[in-house]
Amino acid sequence: MTVLVTKTLRDFGVRRLRSALLLLGIIIGVAGVVAIAYTARNLAGAQRAAYLSASQSDLFIGVRNFPTGLENVIQENDNVKTVESRVSDYLQWSNGGPYRDVLIYGVHDFSNIQINRPTLIAGRWPGKGEAVLDFSSQRLQPVAIGDTIALRESVATAPVYARISGFTRTPGEADASIQARATGYAPAADVQMWRQEPGDNQLLVRLTELRRATETQQAIMRVLNKRGIPHGPGVIRDPQQAVGTKELGALLLLMSVFSVIGVVLSGFLVWNTMAAVMSEEMRQVGILRAIGASRWQVLRTYLLPALIVGVVGSLAGIAVGVAGGGALAGFLGGLIGLALPPFTLAPREILLGLLIGLGVGIGAAIFPAWQGTRVTALELLRNYGIRADYGVGFVQRLLARLRGTSAMLTMGMRNIWRRRVRSVVTMLVVGVGAAAFIGTQALNASVSHTIDTLYATYAADAWLSFNRPMNVQFTGELARDHDIVASEGWVRDDAYVQQTLTDLWGIPADTRLYLHAVTDGRWFLAHNPNEVVVTANLARSLGLHTGDPLTVVFRKRQQTYSIVGIVDDESTYLGSRATGKVFMTPENANNLRGRADSADFFAVRFTDSSPSGVNAALRRVEQQFRVYEPQALAAYEDRSNTQNTIRILSVLLDAMVIVVAAIGVVGLINTLILNISERRRELGILRSIGAGGGALIGLLVSEGIVLGALGYGIGLVGGYALARYLVALAGAELFRMQFTLSPYVLLLTGVLTLVVAAGASVAPGILAARLRPIEAVRYE
């Protein structure tokens, strides 16, 4: 064993660059898988900690003018563990720039926050005339501790001012850059003064037993009704669901696909290198076999280096993967307001890294090593050199007919076929890298195209809501504004169909602002209390068809309708757990909810739909209806927020493609270096007869370009299949997507593949150019 170890270490020392490339390939493969596993575990732990935390409210009830002291009455319920009231207000804030949205919570005692407790990460809690902001608010506009910001209800109201005393992290609150909204905290008295209403408007309850939440909710509502306090229906927390869980799961699943691709490429790299080592040392293997060495004794001679590289690559890959996974988990956790648990290295990550590293190292090496030991000693001891097959093969005959090409280019094109298996493996590595690029670009394009299509379904420029329920006929008042060319009162709420949560929408039958794409049947008619339309994804999920009866349940009320049509609309929002939509008239939706003929919000279209035109029109609308404290969401802003969220997916997938491409580059460089090692004598002869360094660089670059071009051909086929798979996978996790693949992506992939292949070939070309002829010719 001492001799074997000595030989192995000597081989590593002699072939430093090859060994480094081999090690790098395994490190990248292991690191990718470990990073994904580490990220998934930490995010899952952070979500469990946040949503099982003693700080999280189990029950939220919107109230109006909740008096101080009534918490003690609610606290008497045996299932109420803690109860707090707060006041919140949607405002706009500015630090010298454009006004942006902010949700301000008013807290009575910052030293004794028991429910939904934010973490102070800089500065101090605010006093009178002060406020703190979530740290991610700095991504919306520059703001620092000590700055004085302006706050206003709308453009029609005079601003108030607050000094920033610190920054917080809000549990479970998505990043401000995703929501396009900041989150802040201020003394409750200040927020009540800004609202010009006494009392609180939020009731937060922590329960002893979550399974009794509905019973406790009804008991609290009886208390509120008895005292004449207006309130909403209440929301019970689902500890199994967190904002962004579905989206994060889809992202990690897609990234896992690319990490597996990286592992496969690492295996190709090890296989290629071990095959080259066996071809180089055929004579040594023959000598060992001739003096009586068994196949196992010879085999372990070549498996030990693979074992060492596998162990070292695994350990280094685990370290890199944990570091990368920590950065990735921190980034993703910050986007949805999750604080990561303290650093821990789970045994499964160590085991996973070792299994992959050793599996790739030994598993990929054992086949070429075993194949090499199958040859008899006599065949191994024969001269293993160049065969007289010039012009014999099809490719050689084809190249011989080329005219107008340099000798070096022709030689480079011919040389890649001297080691066919090695070249094919290298083409596969390059092809997988090209396929990964095509797949991600197709996924990005499909997501963007689908989002564009979904937003095109809505012809509204903005959505308006007010501080009180408004009758659907309020559209007549809105029509008096000369900027508004169309307005409709819409209803939206949660409902259940066959125990499946869905979105209930009330939209006028003659709507002009919802461009329904009916795929089967028709749109519902006005004044028909029994007709509904469902989305295609809800129909697929529940097996619904046109003409089927449909029972819709809203809390304790339910109504059976007839499905008259199916529309293609899979638009959703961050954190949504609903499947599809059910459309009916606003009258029918309000009847189901047991409410008056009211609208939850109004869809409006302006004469000028440009962002500047929409902003100007909204300012005038807010001024005109300032008594109702209008809140507006511009459609272009909502679309921009969605695109910002999708951009995160694109950036992270592109990062994984870079990792895959890096392995492909390493594989190409490794192949060319192996070729140089085997052809030192030829290269020395070329130098001795006058070939310059530039000619040898051109020779290697031409080989790399040919390998890249052929790999690109493989990548075209594999890329289309991978693109289809990724789009289908993402569609199953998020929303159904329209497959989009531009010919320009295929052209760009080809150009990038050739450029990268040529660039990766320069370094081996320089090594070839630096060979001294006398040393190269002496090489045995």
Region spans (language model):
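Membrane transport/envelope proteins' first extracytoplasmic loop
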Residues: 1-264, 276, 295-296, 454-458, ...
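N-terminal Sec/SRP start-transfer signal
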Residues: 1-30, 303, 391-432, 701, ...
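Short cytosolic juxtamembrane segments of multi-pass membrane proteins
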Residues: 2, 374-392, 769-780
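Interfacial "coupling" helices/loops that link adjacent transmembrane helices in transporter permeases
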Residues: 15, 268-310, 667-705
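Juxtamembrane segments of multi-pass membrane proteins
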Residues: 59-64, 405-528, 533-537, 545-548, ...
